[in-house]
UniProtKB/Swiss-Prot annotation:
GO terms for biological process: carbohydrate phosphorylation; N-glycan processing to lysosome. The gene is GNPTG. Disulfide bonds join 71-84, 129-157, 142-169. It comes from Homo sapiens (Human). Residues 176-279 form the DMAP1-binding domain. Homodimer; disulfide-linked. Hexamer of two alpha (GNPTAB), two beta (GNPTAB) and two gamma (GNPTG) subunits; disulfide-linked. The alpha and/or the beta subunits of the enzyme constitute the catalytic subunits. Cys-245 mediates the formation of the interchain disulfide bond for formation of the homodimer. Cys-142, Cys-157 and Cys-169 are involved in intramolecular disulfide bonds formation. Residues 69-171 form the MRH domain. Glycans are attached at residues 88, 115. Widely expressed. PANTHER family: N-ACETYLGLUCOSAMINE-1-PHOSPHOTRANSFERASE SUBUNIT GAMMA (PTHR12630:SF6), N-LINKED OLIGOSACCHARIDE PROCESSING (PTHR12630). This is N-acetylglucosamine-1-phosphotransferase subunit gamma. Residues 1-24 form the signal peptide.
């Protein structure tokens, strides 16, 4: 009896204590503003950043390969930039808006080479920006630690990044020749000898070296440099190159021919825009006799007004 009474008193004491005070609960500190749309696990996978293609293979100086698989970030103004060597460059808007912008500023594409030196990393085929794709050039500079030091946008949709690393502090760290396999080094030696013997012109020398760098995988061929087609068809490519203009002209010519055939098939006359009189251009139409039915620019008919 006494034991049962003791248990009853114990239960009553616990219920009287009530729940723990709200102040005792732990609070999680959010270090960065909203990243909705990027790291939200409840969103479908399609809402996350999606690249148009895979990055190019890792290439260049072997001592830089250790940077592959790592990412370095920098917050400037209201944007967070992230550079992942040999992978991509991304931008994330730091805001509390539900639709904060996040996008890809470029995917690892090729090196830039000048005077036997790797002068920069090109990240191309980023997210759409008007009629073109965003792209970034990353300059490697000597520094005490690996860090993304600076980001700017010198022209619309083109970004310039400076990445500091102790891996490029040696004066020969970015030379191209030592990174080449023996066979390509011998080819380069022959090209230099031919130039010295005046067997090739400076222009020919430059062209041969470019081909050599393409064989090494440091530069892309002209065909590989064709812009990746944006979602929405060929019209969304824009006219970034002469080849694109030629392709677009050819497609438009075929479409015009097809439409003319349809008009002829349905017995609908058509005239060229250049045949319109000056008075019509000025808004004064030449008087015409009314007809019961007036043809429009499509196969349909419109009744008299």
């Amino acid at each position: 009896m006494a034991a049962g009474l003791a248990r009853l008193l114990l239960l009553l004491g616990l219920s009287a204590g009530g729940p723990a005070p709200a102040g005792a609960a732990k609070m999680k500190v959010v270090e960065e503003p909203n990243a909705f749309g990027v790291n939200n696990p409840f969103l479908p996978q399609a809402s996350r950043l999606q690249a148009k293609r895979d990055p190019s293979p890792v290439s260049g100086p072997v001592h830089l390969f250790r940077l592959s698989g790592k990412c370095f970030s920098l917050v400037e103004s209201t944007y967070k930039y992230e550079f992942c060597p040999f992978h991509n460059v991304t931008q994330h808007e730091q805001t509390f808006r539900w639709n904060a912008y996040s996008g890809i500023l470029g995917i690892w594409h090729e090196w830039e080479i000048a005077n036997n030196t790797f002068t920069g990393m090109w990240m191309r085929d980023g997210d759409a920006c008007r009629s073109r794709s965003r792209q970034s050039k990353v300059e490697l500079a000597c520094g005490k630690s690996n860090r993304l030091a600076h980001v700017s946008e010198p022209s619309t949709c083109v970004y310039a990044l400076t990445f500091e690393t102790p891996l490029v502090c040696h004066p020969h760290a970015l030379l191209v020749y030592p990174t080449l396999p023996e066979a390509l080094q011998r080819q380069w030696d022959q090209v230099e000898q031919d130039l010295a013997d005046e067997l090739i012109t400076p222009q020919g020398h430059e062209k041969l070296l470019r081909t050599l760098f393409e064989d090494a995988g440091y530069l892309k061929t002209p065909e590989e440099n064709e812009p990746t087609q944006l979602e929405g068809g060929p019209d969304s490519l824009g006219f970034e190159t002469l080849e694109n203009c030629r392709k677009a002209h050819k497609e438009l010519s075929k479409e015009i021919k097809r439409l003319k055939g349809l008009l002829t098939q349905h017995g609908i006359p058509y005239t060229r825009p250049t045949e319109t009189s000056n008075l019509e251009h000025l808004g004064h139409e030449t008087p015409r006799a009314k007809s019961p039915e007036q043809l429009r620019g499509d196969p349909g008919l419109r009744g008299s007004l």
